[in-house]
Amino acid sequence: MHTKGPTPQQHDGSALRIGIVHARWNETIIEPLLAGTKAKLLACGVKESNIVVQSVPGSWELPIAVQRLYSASQLQTPSSGPSLSAGDLLGSSTTDLTALPTTTASSTGPFDALIAIGVLIKGETMHFEYIADSVSHGLMRVQLDTGVPVIFGVLTVLTDDQAKARAGVIEGSHNHGEDWGLAAVEMGVRRRDWAAGKTE
């Protein structure tokens, strides 16, 4: 049973665009964390098309990847006209131009929140401490520099079992990815409110 953390709040994520960057180190732990995160985003109304997932080799690369992913999203502009995939050109031709798919603002605009997911397990050297400290500070810097919430989904644990418990793969344990999904929706909604001058 999960007894720590804030009481979950209900927020409508249907208008949000969320970016996720995850490390591939400790993949057996990463996979359930990512699944839990995405499941909670979808449960909060975030559209599948508005969830963008990228991976990097390890947690060390998370800050630069999160930063550049957000920068790339700022360069995207919504299309005002028809947008066709290569398959659409032949497979689903139509003379009714109003029936053609279009790219919506929510599926191409800047992200409302970003989630960084990684797993650091302490070994015999100081490598763990250096990486954990640098990644923590790096991700904090990204969110303060961009003004976009970056959810800290990096486990810093002492043993494999601690990691498994926090990924919800041990019976009776809680998947922390669900918490990260909820936090991303809440902070994404708040960011939009702040941008609109809302303080209540």
From Swiss-Prot:
Catalyzes the formation of 6,7-dimethyl-8-ribityllumazine by condensation of 5-amino-6-(D-ribitylamino)uracil with 3,4-dihydroxy-2-butanone 4-phosphate. This is the penultimate step in the biosynthesis of riboflavin. Keywords: Riboflavin biosynthesis, Transferase. The active site is at H127 (proton donor). NCBIfam families: lumazine-synth. The keyword Electron transport does not apply. Its EC number is 2.5.1.78. It catalyses: (2S)-2-hydroxy-3-oxobutyl phosphate + 5-amino-6-(D-ribitylamino)uracil = 6,7-dimethyl-8-(1-D-ribityl)lumazine + phosphate + 2 H2O + H(+). 5-amino-6-(D-ribitylamino)uracil binds at W25, S59, W60, E61, V119, L120, I121, F152. It comes from the Eukaryota. This is 6,7-dimethyl-8-ribityllumazine synthase. One of its GO terms (molecular function) is 6,7-dimethyl-8-ribityllumazine synthase activity. (2S)-2-hydroxy-3-oxobutyl phosphate binds at E124, T125, R166.
